[in-house]
């Protein structure tokens, strides 16, 4: 396999209860994650050596983002470091909106590169890598509506709400990393 295309869904939190602060800096939470019909599109093409990112958003073209970080962490598991990847992303999920776009992109990158590079890493290992990237990444690896506890990484499948939702996006950016 030399090429994979995928869609990365957004999510909303139907509720969020922030509990105690942990030693690792995260907070324990209780939340309800709901996948929504808003997507970023990504493609992955096997190349040699480098990780290259092309995007409609300039800030994603460098190395300081969840896509590059995820690809680098997966690449550490290659016995043949000659593999690389060209990742193209069409960003549609508003950045900093709390909809999980970066986490969704990270999860898609982990899943796609495990397939593209034939790594056959276990689900447990993939989730472990996901947790290193961010608290919401395991939810997007899970890929279903869920009740989240712990830092949001302990997941129990829940049913979908059957209502139409109207989304409102703020022009404010939420610096999620700041609140770790």
Label the model's feature ranges.
Residues 2-83:
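N-terminal beta-alpha supersecondary unit
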Residues 30, 85-97:
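Short pre-catalytic strand/loop immediately N-terminal to key active-site residues, enriched for Gly-Thr
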Residues 2-7, 15-31, 119-180:
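ATP-dependent small-molecule kinase catalytic core of the GHMP/sugar-kinase superfamily
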Residues 58-65, 69, 94, 100, ...:
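Residues at secondary-structure transition points
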Residues 76-86, 112-129, 133:
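Phosphate-handling active-site elements
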Residues 11, 105, 136:
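Acidic active-site catalytic centers that drive phospho-/nucleotidyl reactions
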Residues 97-126, 139:
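DPxDG-like acidic metal-binding loop motif
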